[in-house]
Swiss-Prot record:
GO terms for biological process: anther development; lipid hydroxylation; medium-chain fatty acid biosynthetic process; pollen exine formation; sporopollenin biosynthetic process. Disruption phenotype: Male sterile. Defective in pollen exine and anther epicuticular layer development. This is Cytochrome P450 703A2. The chain crosses the membrane at residues 3-23. Pfam families: p450. The lineage of its organism: Eukaryota, Viridiplantae, Streptophyta, Embryophyta, Tracheophyta.
Amino acid sequence: MDPFLLSIILCSWIFVVVSWKKLNCMRRRLPPGPPRWPIFGNLLQLSPLPHKDFARFCTKYGPLVYLRLGTIDAITTDDPEVIREILIRQDEVFASRPRTLAAVHLAYGCGDVALAPLGPNWKRMRRVCMEHLLTTKRLESFAAHRALEAEHLCQFVWAKAQSGKPVNLREVLGAFSMNNVTRMLLGKQYFGLQSAGPGEAMEFMHITHELFWLLGLIYLGDYLPAWRWLDPYGCEKKMREVEKKVDDFHQKIIDEHRKAREAKKSASLDDDNKEDMDFVDVLLSLPGENGKEHMDDVEIKALMQDMIAAATDTSSVTNEWVMAEVIKNPRVLRKIQEELDGVVGRGRMVAESDLGQLTYLRCVVRESFRMHPAGPFLIPHESLKPTTIMGYDIPARTRIFINTHALGRNTRIWDDVDAFRPERHLPASADGGRVEISHLPDFKILPFSAGKRKCPGAPLGVILVLMALARLFHCFDWSPPDGLRPDDIDTQEVYGMTMPKAKPLVAVATPRLPPQMYGRHGKQV
């Protein structure tokens, strides 16, 4: 064909497509939003801290903002009423997930629970979690393991205090969360005297951190398909590398468990006593789909990854933020300890049965979730069909960014947003009931999402957060390292799928209970 004629046809086709899209947009009543560039849309208006850019848009344009991110329609909000509309009233419309490249590479083709689009596979995998892994009975069966890890945590901090050394709280809280999850999931701990070894532990931590960093990226290839051909920063290449490392690690765990089960069968031992089984053993014992004898390894690995990711990094990030804010505000520490002394006393350690009575500590955790949510956004949702919100048209396949960071600092619903004030969450009356850590009907705080996509591991996450904090505040007084005042505690954050402190929290612990309460010696974490 004549090159000139081909050019005319191509230009005409582009003109028709652009004109049709422009006309279609004019017919729709989209929510207000910032002006958009051709091709890129609003992508060029985003900084390395997109949650703050989105909050700025909501301040300027209203509680519901429309964005065009390359080829993708998107909305963002930090308003409780809009969030309730999305997660509860129109849950059936907005409960799906977008198929991002990170989810495809790092979540087994979106075959897990957290990142999978809404559909039969997601329903089945979530049912496996709720009916076999995260039941109340199964979580209670690991209570002794959690108590042991809490004991190890306090003994390690006590040993540091005896030697006069400050405590790196990021390390010890990370080890506490990781050990609790890996004991339940894999039947082993990765830190401590009975650990699987420092090499395997470091490999495990490194893989987890890489995974979270990549999942938190706003990768341009998801919004501009042509970018994938360039990939100048090698993001997709890195995803494939981490994908292989994650898969190899998970496969090794499955092979170890399968080998142990075969050995038990050879020795005529009962390998299906579910009370003594870790999560991987339970998954290996379950039937697969469509009459298969067992679940596929890929399905098992996808669920393993969800459990590890959801219950380790998020709970340790939350605990570090709480510790930072409490050390920065000594009056809050005194009130927490007064409550602990009243509920628990100084003659025994905090037990899980005490956690529901620790009203002020629960308010402290809620206030930390307000100021420092584990992640800047909920995991993005995607609309399954066209709908309306507040009278505005929302197209099908619109990506939804619920800005939890901005929600907690929204001056329309919170006063004195930069002050750490747990008292704002106290019940109106003394008998107002237990303070809930998860979301309340007002949707002002949303640590575990809501609706169909609410985190299935929320009860476990709450226990891990409260238990670590209660033990550390009950057993020790806390202060900044020598030369620093409480006001010097840094609260800068790092953007990602989770938002940890920019610098690890280091503090000095001083025992406040009788010496015999800490055991004979500190154990290594």
